[in-house]
C-alpha cells in the first residue's frame, strides 16, 4: 500500500511510523522540509490541486499511484484561522481522492459535538457550542456532502510519543508539572472524568478505518481508555515519576476572559472550557466492536510517557 499523509505534526508523524513499520510505502506532503522517519517528504501545500495530483499519481515522485490519503494538516488554535485555512485544503484533497477513487481518512476532535461529548458515540448528531466547534461541524458536513469516500476518526485530547507540551493540554498542564513535583493546573472541574486518546491508538484506528470509508463520511470513534479525572491523571503522573502528589489547581475562568482580547488561544480555550467542566467520555464504536481494536492500557501509556520506566514506590 502507498499512503499519502498531508501534514507532519503529532498525528502525521505517528502515522508514518506505524505505516512504514508495517512495510507500507509512505509519502508525506508538508509545508516544511524536515525529514519524517520512514517516509519520503515533499514540501508543498495540500491546497494546490496540481501539485497534489502530481504527487498522488506518482508523476512528481516517480512512484506508484497512492492508495489512500491521510489528511492531517492543522492550523493555529483560532476559529478564524481554521475557517480560512482548513476548508479549502480539505476540499482539494477530497477532489483529488474522488478523481483517483481512493479513500481519505481524517483525524477528528470532539468539538463538533458540543456537550454531546459527555457521552460521545458514532451516531451522535453534530451540535457545536463554540466557534471552533462550528468550524469542525462545517468540515464534517462538507465531507458528508462530497463524493469522495471518507472516514473521520474521532479522538479526545491526545497524549503520546509525538505530543508536545504545546500540542497536548494533558501533557503540558497535567503530566509535565506533576512529574516535576509541582501542582497541576487544570481546566474546568478537576474531578470530572475526561477521556484521553493516545496518538498511537488514533494512528492505528485511522489505518484500520481505510476499508470503512464511504461516500457520506463514515464517523468512527478511536479506541480510548476509561475516562479519568484530571486530579487522578495528575496523581498517576506523579506516582509514575516517583514524585509526591501536589495540590491540583483550577485555572480561574476570569483569567481566560481577561487574556482573551490579547490571546487568540486563550479566547478559544475560554469557549472550550465546557469540555472540562463536565464529564467527557468516548463510547467504543465499530473499530472496537467489529474489528477488535482496543485502547492502550492507561498504565502502559503512563510508563511510555515517562520513558519506559515507572518508579517503584518503595524506592522513591
Q: Predicted segments — roles?
A:
Residues 91-135, 151:
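Conserved Rossmann-fold NAD(P)-dependent oxidoreductase catalytic core, especially the SDR/UDP-sugar
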Residues 109, 141-164:
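Conserved beta-loop-beta element that borders a ligand/cofactor-binding pocket
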Residues 160-173, 209-220, 243-244:
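Glycine/proline-rich active-site loop of Rossmann-fold NAD(P)-dependent oxidoreductases
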Residues 174-197:
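A conserved pocket-lining segment of Rossmann-fold NAD(P)-dependent short-chain dehydrogenase/reductase
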Residues 187-192, 218-228, 236-242, 289-291:
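Glycine-rich Rossmann NAD(P)(H)-binding loop
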Residues 234-281, 314-316:
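Terminal hydrophobic/aromatic helix or amphipathic segment near a protein terminus
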Residues 286-288, 292-316:
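Amphipathic terminal alpha-helices
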Amino acid at each position: 500500500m502507498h499512503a499519502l499523509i498531508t501534514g507532519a505534526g503529532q498525528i502525521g508523524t505517528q502515522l508514518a511510523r506505524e505505516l512504514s513499520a508495517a512495510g507500507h510505502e509512505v509519502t508525506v506532503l508538508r509545508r516544511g522540509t524536515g525529514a519524517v522517519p520512514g517516509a519520503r517528504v515533499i514540501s508543498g501545500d495540500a491546497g494546490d490541486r496540481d501539485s497534489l495530483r502530481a504527487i498522488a499519481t506518482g508523476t512528481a515522485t516517480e512512484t506508484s499511484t497512492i492508495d489512500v490519503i491521510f489528511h492531517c494538516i492543522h492550523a493555529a488554535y483560532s476559529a478564524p484561522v481554521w475557517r480560512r485555512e482548513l476548508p479549502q485544503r480539505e476540499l482539494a484533497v477530497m477532489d483529488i481522492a474522488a478523481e483517483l477513487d481512493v479513500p481519505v481518512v481524517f483525524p477528528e476532535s470532539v468539538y463538533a459535538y458540543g456537550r454531546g461529548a459527555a457521552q460521545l458515540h458514532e451516531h451522535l448528531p453534530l451540535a457545536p457550542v463554540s466557534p471552533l466547534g462550528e468550524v469542525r461541524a462545517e468540515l464534517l458536513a462538507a465531507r458528508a456532502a462530497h463524493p469522495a469516500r471518507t472516514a473521520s476518526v474521532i479522538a479526545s485530547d491526545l497524549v503520546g510519543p509525538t505530543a508536545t507540551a504545546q500540542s497536548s493540554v494533558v501533557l503540558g498542564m497535567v503530566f509535565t508539572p506533576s512529574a516535576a513535583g509541582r501542582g497541576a493546573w487544570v481546566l474546568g472541574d478537576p474531578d470530572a472524568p475526561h477521556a484521553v486518546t493516545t496518538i498511537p491508538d488514533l494512528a492505528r484506528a485511522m489505518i484500520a478505518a481505510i476499508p470503512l470509508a464511504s461516500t457520506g463520511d463514515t464517523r468512527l470513534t478511536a479506541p480510548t481508555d476509561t475516562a479519568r479525572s484530571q486530579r487522578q491523571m495528575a496523581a498517576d503522573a506523579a506516582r509514575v515519576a516517583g514524585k509526591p502528589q501536589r495540590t491540583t489547581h483550577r485555572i480561574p475562568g476570569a483569567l481566560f476572559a481577561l487574556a482573551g482580547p490579547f490571546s487568540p488561544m486563550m479566547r478559544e480555550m475560554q469557549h472550550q472550557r465546557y469540555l472540562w467542566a463536565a464529564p467527557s467520555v468516548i463510547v467504543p464504536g465499530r473499530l472496537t466492536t467489529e474489528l477488535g481494536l482496543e485502547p492502550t492500557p492507561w498504565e502502559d501509556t503512563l510508563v511510555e510517557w515517562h520513558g519506559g520506566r515507572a518508579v517503584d514506590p518503595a524506592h522513591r
